[in-house]
Amino acid sequence: MSSVRLPSVDRLLRSAAAAPLHQRYGREALLATLRDLLDELREPARHGALAEIELSEAVLAGRAGERLAAQHASRVRRVFNLTGTVLHTNLGRALLPDEAIEAITLAARYPLNLEFDLASGKRGDRDDLIAGLIRELTGAEAVTVVNNNAAAVLLALNSLGARKEGIISRGELIEIGGAFRIPDIMARAGVRLHEVGTTNRTHAKDYEAAIGPRSGLLMRVHTSNYSVQGFTASVPTAQLAAIAHGHGLPLLEDLGSGTLVDLTRWGLPKEPTVQEALADGADIVTFSGDKLLGGPQAGLILGNRELIGRIKKNPLKRALRVDKLTLAALEAVLGLYRDPDRLAERLTTLRLLSRPAAEIRAQAERLAPALGEALGEGWEVAVVDALGMIGSGAQPVARLASAALCLRPRQPRRLRGRALRNLEEALRGLPLPVIGRLDDDALWLDLRQLDDEPAFLAQLPRLRSELS
């Protein structure tokens, strides 16, 4: 095959085929992409490895358009979370309700009274935007908000216990994802760790014996991401608060996931509530906004007015504070808790957590034939019972009854691993990536969180081409 002459960059730029790309991406981006593309094709064209049609204006503009679309595609992608873990840290944790999304849009689009008191016309406090709701819902005297619960714990410790000892049970020295360890956080906060008791048993006398002139606070941490069972003992919040207050010390309780309602009402495992911790005497309570609360990422610090005041004066507070979008979403989510009877209908996270297994199974039965057709005869598609998780460290041993589509390759066991990896990759390559979990030589798609059934079905025909 003889060599083919490449069109010039200028000719391509002025072509009708490139006009939409110029309009959408701008001249500079289009110019750079066309130059790169022509540079790659110059050698094959010289050696006759390309046909004339492959170098037409329409074809080259099309290839440039594909590259530009990939370059300009958002790195933030919507996905289907079919892992069975509702509050999946890697997939964004809590899904916000419509009320919160509308509040974020309003706050993003218009000026608002973030730190402006409309009554007095003077500078305000951004925490006041949710303070009234928090007092109403929890009975806390005061509140401040930072960007996550790790920041809340760090700020509270530094404000109340810097250069002093923090007394905590050895069984509560937790580690969560991302290298968050209570001993390390205490050290960063300037608090000297004084651990008491043993891994499985800590008594009131252990705390009493540890208190001395260097003591700054007592700390209690809810071990939400693991469970110690068997021969165990711990000191309840009320008793620990009495010990702390008897020595003039504050009690800081970190609830981790945190919830404002009794989850057993919806058939979910019991989690300690913020109200219970405060009623039992905790002076400061910290918890997350984007876990069981069902809101945006945030760390809430509630409790004694004087102690919250000290925390708010800490210079670290400004470094850790939240923005207007977070506060707008948080206020909207908290507002839903005023009507607990409709909470499971309106709060997305609670609705998904409490979704009946029978409803999920019926959905799986509807979807199985379409998925089987998309995968072809090389795959077995079965509807099976499944056990999901709350996620994000909440109730680690509890399971949520669910249903899943179990996808198993009809191949010898030694070949299944590669087939499953290819299927995982193909599902991730769909326009709306599908994320499942591997278990027992199969890929499981737990449907608890599949809200948009039409969108899931619409892209299944592409699956076979992705696998080929």
Swiss-Prot record:
UniProt keyword Ion transport, yes or no: no
Superkingdom of origin: Bacteria
Listed pathway(s): Aminoacyl-tRNA biosynthesis; selenocysteinyl-tRNA(Sec) biosynthesis; selenocysteinyl-tRNA(Sec) from L-seryl-tRNA(Sec) (bacterial route): step 1/1
Subcellular localization(s) per the UniProt record: Cytoplasm
Gene Ontology molecular functions: L-seryl-tRNA(Sec) selenium transferase activity
E.C. code: 2.9.1.1
Principal location: cytoplasm
Key words of the record: Cytoplasm, Protein biosynthesis, Pyridoxal phosphate, Selenium, Transferase
Residues where N6-(pyridoxal phosphate)lysine is found: 291
GO biological process: conversion of seryl-tRNAsec to selenocys-tRNAsec; selenocysteine incorporation
GO terms for cellular component: cytoplasm
Cofactor: pyridoxal 5'-phosphate
Reactions catalysed, as given in the entry: L-seryl-tRNA(Sec) + selenophosphate + H(+) = L-selenocysteinyl-tRNA(Sec) + phosphate
Keyword Ribosomal protein: no
One Pfam family in the UniProt entry: Se-cys_synth_N
Listed HAMAP family: SelA
Family: Belongs to the SelA family.
Functional note: Converts seryl-tRNA(Sec) to selenocysteinyl-tRNA(Sec) required for selenoprotein biosynthesis.
Name of the featured protein: L-seryl-tRNA(Sec) selenium transferase
